[in-house]
Amino acid sequence: MDAVRETENEKTFEIYFGGTYTECWSEDYSLAIRYSSRRSVTARRVDGVWRAIGGDAELCAELESASCPAAMREYFDAAATVYAAARDCVERGLPLERLRECLPVQKSAYAAAELMRLLMDDCGLKLKAALEICAECCEDCRMADADEKELLPYQPRTAHIVSVLRDVSSKQLTAVHDARSIRFRCPVGAVRSGEELRLSFRLASGKINSAALVLYGDDLDLEYAMESSGELYSAYIAPQSPAALWYCFHLDTDEGERWLCPDGSGYYGRLYSERRSGFRLTVFCRDFETPAWFRRSVMYQIFPDRFAFSDDDTASRGIEYHKSLGQTPELHKSLDEPVRYWPREFETSYSPDDFYGGTLRGIESKLPYLKELGVTCLYLNPIVEARSNHRYDSSDYLKVDPILGTNEDFTHLCVTARGMGIRIMLDGVYSHTGADSVYFNRYGAYPDTGACQGTQSPYYSWYDFRHFPDDYRCWWGFKDLPEVNERNGAWQDFVVSGEDSVVKTWLRRGASGWRLDVADELPDDTLALIRSAVKSVDPDAPVLGEVWEDAVIKESYGGRRNYALGYSLDSVMNYPFRAAALDFIHRRIDAFVLRDFLISQQMNYPAPMYYSLMNLLGTHDTDRIRTALATSTTIRGMSREDQLRLRFDDESLRLALRREKLCAVLQFAIPGVPSIYYGDEQGMCGVGDPFNRLPFREGDNELHDLYAQLANMRGANPALSTGDAVFMAYNADILLVLRYVRGGVDHFGASAENGAFLAVINRGAAQCFDVECPEEYDFGRLSGLADEFSAKIIKV
């Protein structure tokens, strides 16, 4: 590619003028162009303007003079821009089919002609493939504003391409739609019900008889006629009902039907001869909002038995209480004792009832540590009375487990935390109870009449017995976890909607929000009922659901769930983000794929939920992030014995710490609520449950300091919490995240300090980056040095 040749190891390009050319056809009808008698200048971009800095002195003088002919200057600028983009494309490891990643849309007709010449002559592309790329990158493929006679003296081959383009663009059909661009989709992203939305495509070349927008979902399939304004075809719609929808464009041509549907990115259009999956469109409730404080928060997740310990006999007294119920808890004598994962002599299977003795008073004693770390939201795994150490088998919904403390301890913790700017979110387990509970009372340990004692129990109707009392519906077949009937009126009144319900009581005791365990297991109408109950007590309390997949299009139990449409949840656990971050670090995907994933979440989640997503790297249900980064082995699903056989040498663990720093910067750079699983900021390791739930240890100060720096930077700069976001990839290794506030207001229109920050995440060798920010954001080019295997957030 002589057009993309470097000189002196700088970003300079040889631009050729005049001369003659010969078309040379091979036996297989491949075309090669031979040039002769050409003159050239060296071009370099200086302060955003292309300058002729060397080469033919006469040409340089003419190009730099005020009297330079317009056609000559336009060709020079167009050629230099096209060559720079082509080289950038090669250096970034992209195929030419993705040249649009490197070339902002060009309005110059000469740019289209010169790009076609480059693609066909220098790169060997066939005319159709070259035209498709050209249509994506250039406005004027029809050569409406081009004069080949004016161009002829400066570049005869490109002048000839003008006439070629003019001819082929009248016959060959190309169309452009980019769902990320306000030109084609306004507004971009999810829309509120009843909000007007314009969807457009540009007919870059060829002719059509008519075009229609096809809008469809689970319960509709509609067509809207589109009107044209020049090359732009548009339809205006205002969907009235919240739903996960899709759309595509139906083109009628003399040659038959064509469908403009997304390519693999999910947002860029391609023409197909048959209808394919469409572009996604989320319509959510018009009045849906999420708590502003939560969108700005930094979350810290605590497994209560393992985080902090009080210098008293709270835990030991709690152990004795559980023993009095006929249970078999064990209290470790030391934090150094290994966690138990095997069945005891009297058991046939492992029972997670070994305790280290963490307490609520212990958590309160660590509040200064959490405040210094920058935490503003504390998410506690279940704290109510239960048989197990994880407490997802609730025994008494209204009582703090005695091993942790008392209800009064909880209220005191909430008051103290709130005084330090920290709010507390509780974990609600409402799809099932424990079998050994006040409500089910399978073993008769509680004095109250439980469901297993007969129909006279006030809780009997909560459960579904197939054959009383031993055969009943239970969670995933676990007999210790009987499922409840969430549509039962008595259950709803006790747990959700009654004046003194479980949900409302804990909010009045000081909690500031709820995380709902296994939200998949709760019907949509029950989730909506919980939301209503929560908001009736505290409109500022978030409701967060455990959802492992894309919550917008999640299907379970035979239907599409409405988690993200504004009916029920404010937020979900963003496990897909964790998976994408790990895939990027382990080189299973590149920065372009990661960027596309981040854009897809930004576009498909309603903004109030998107900025509230719980962006996690680890939880009690995953292997710890440091461990996940130390190995490419998939740990989830392995037996506990096999997990313990995994060995990590010092080098692997050191590498994992470096990798975790990259993940942490990414986590704090994107919109949403960054969540730290206790101890991850100290570099704690651990495979799956229960080895990811070990007692908290202080360890890596450098890692801790990074998390504190990131959290406090986010807290001090609205741009990093509720500012707008732009995602870019320089090459396979470098991801860029631009966050900014302009005009004194954030994404939600709230008053906010102006500012802009750029996160640079580089998983590869040290290298310079230089990218053009999308035109609509008006940030121009962003460039700098990315150190080897590093991540940083810099002020722009």
What is the role of each PLM region?
Residues 171-296, 309:
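Glycan-association/targeting regions that enable binding to alpha-glucans and other polysaccharides
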Residues 305, 557-558, 564, 570-571, ...:
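Aromatic/acidic polysaccharide-binding cleft in carbohydrate-active enzymes
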Residues 303-376, 383-509, 530-536, 553:
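Substrate-binding/active-site clefts of carbohydrate-active enzymes
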Residues 205, 244, 298, 780-796:
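C-terminal beta-strand-rich structural cap/linker in extracellular carbohydrate-active enzymes
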Residues 414-423, 431-432, 437-448, 512, ...:
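Active-site-proximal helices and loops of the catalytic beta/alpha 8
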Residues 1-172:
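A conserved ligand/cofactor-binding region detector
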